[in-house]
């Protein structure tokens, strides 16, 4: 049977395409009969010799299920051939809806042929990005003495020095370093892991439950105190979660921040050989910080340029996937403006497609070291072991594709920035910070 189906276009809207296929019933019947004959030739059934089962009996037994298999196979064969031979470019996603089943599968009236619709989205034509036509800010910051002083103040705050308090009338307050011993009990029984000797922490840093820290405020060196403490339901130690326990706490040692008013002492406390070494450390640190901030500003400027300069029809299916990811990432309060969220998802997809076009044209590819570096910075630095993240990368395809996509996008952005024209601008640290915060 040469022409066993006909096809007509039913949808052509932006990237969406739709085609209706009508397959002759005779073709379906022929395929079903072939399969049933194959079963009859090999079937073993009570009352029949092998290969002697009547075709009518086989059709009654297996006809409906075989017809379903044939329909599925016919749809797959026709659709695959149609998409392969059609000039559609890349296919984003496709779906089939059966409009009418063949008569062999049902008691439908008419000629009984199979009718189904194949709908799909095609990949858009993405324009070539003109890297030579891009100009980005290259920011140079003039580091002032005030910037260095501010850096050293941060250094002093981040690496505080403490001195013991001998005044027994001095109560504990925020910022003090406290050494305590404590024990806990639930219904009169000691809790596993609920006691410690010589435990040291800085009050107000969130190292302990807020309710616990509030009870410590005002206590004096050598003082003991008993109080009830309720652990939250989501507390990481499950045998504490949701319990109200009896606590007994003793303050063993109290230290306060030692005010350092000269650079020589600060340099010595922080392990520098000299004040000059410390100032060089500060200057180098500021240069790195400002370079990172300038890089973020350039990236934002690049993405804004691409968004404003190029138009791309984005596939709805990919936008819906991106929107789903965004909803999972955002807090509930950020989900109210559905229109703005959809617009951002469309923008992300558009920029991603432009960057992938650059990657393809320029031969930018993801290397193993790129992935390891990305994981080290974005996951391992936040308490996840490299081994755990790599295991997740190996076993979860969605996570693997997410990481590879982010790595490639970052690499392409750096590639474009390195080749774009530069508008060198000199500014103060304050001006750069304002620009950075507006990104």
Swiss-Prot record:
The highest taxon in the source lineage is Bacteria
Q: Where is the PPIase FKBP-type domain?
A: 175-260
* The EC number(s) this enzyme carries: 5.2.1.8
UniProt record, GO biological process:
cell division; protein folding; protein transport
Q: What class of enzyme is it?
A: isomerase
Compartmental location: Cytoplasm
GO CC annotations?
cytoplasm
Q: Which family does it belong to?
A: Belongs to the FKBP-type PPIase family. Tig subfamily.
Please report the name of this protein according to its UniProt entry. Trigger factor
**Species of the source:** Anaplasma phagocytophilum (strain HZ)
Q: Lineage of this protein's species?
A: Bacteria, Pseudomonadati, Pseudomonadota, Alphaproteobacteria, Rickettsiales
């Amino acid at each position: 049977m040469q022409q066993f189906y006909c096809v007509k276009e039913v949808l052509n809207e932006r990237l969406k395409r739709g085609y209706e296929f009508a397959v002759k019933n005779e073709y379906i019947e022929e395929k079903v009969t072939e399969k049933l004959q194959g079963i009859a030739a090999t079937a073993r059934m009570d009352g029949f010799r092998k290969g002697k089962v009547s075709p009518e009996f086989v059709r009654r037994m297996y006809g409906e299920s075989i017809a379903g298999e044939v329909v599925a196979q016919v749809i797959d064969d026709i659709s695959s051939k149609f998409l392969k031979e059609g000039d559609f470019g890349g296919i984003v996603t496709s779906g089939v809806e059966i409009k009418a089943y063949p008569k062999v599968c049902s008691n439908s009236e008419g000629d009984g042929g199979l009718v189904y619709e194949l709908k799909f989205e095609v990949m858009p034509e993405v324009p070539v990005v003109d890297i030579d036509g891009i100009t980005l800010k290259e920011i140079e910051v003039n580091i002032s003495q005030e910037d260095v002083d501010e850096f050293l103040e941060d250094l002093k705050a981040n690496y505080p020095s403490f001195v013991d308090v001998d005044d027994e009338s001095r109560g504990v307050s925020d910022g003090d370093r406290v050494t305590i011993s404590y024990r806990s009990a639930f219904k009169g029984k000691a809790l596993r892991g609920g006691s410690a000797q010589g435990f040291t922490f800085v009050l107000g840093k969130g190292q302990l439950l807020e309710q616990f820290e509030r009870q410590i405020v005002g206590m004096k060196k050598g003082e003991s105190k008993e109080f009830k403490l309720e652990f939250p339901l989501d507390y990481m130690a499950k045998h504490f979660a949701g319990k109200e326990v009896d606590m007994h706490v003793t303050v063993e040692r109290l230290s306060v921040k030692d005010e350092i008013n000269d650079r020589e002492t600060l340099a010595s406390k922080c392990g520098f050989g000299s004040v000059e070494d410390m100032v060089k450390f500060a200057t180098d640190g500021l240069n790195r910080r400002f370079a990172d901030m300038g890089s973020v500003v350039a990236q934002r400027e690049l993405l804004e340029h691409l968004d404003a300069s190029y138009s791309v029809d984005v596939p709805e299916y990919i936008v819906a996937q991106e929107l789903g990811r965004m909803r999972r990432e955002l807090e509930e309060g950020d989900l109210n403006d559905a229109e703005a969220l959809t617009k951002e998802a469309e923008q992300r997809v558009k920029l991603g497609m432009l960057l992938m076009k650059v990657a393809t044209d320029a031969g930018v590819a993801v290397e193993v070291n790129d992935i390891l570096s990305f994981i080290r910075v974005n996951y391992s630095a936040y308490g996840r072991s490299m081994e755990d993240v790599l295991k997740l990368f190996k076993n979860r395809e969605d996570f693997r594709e997410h990481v590879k996509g982010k790595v490639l996008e970052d690499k392409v952005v750096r590639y474009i920035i390195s080749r774009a024209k530069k508008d060198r601008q000199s500014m103060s640290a304050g001006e750069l910070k304002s620009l950075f915060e507006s990104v």
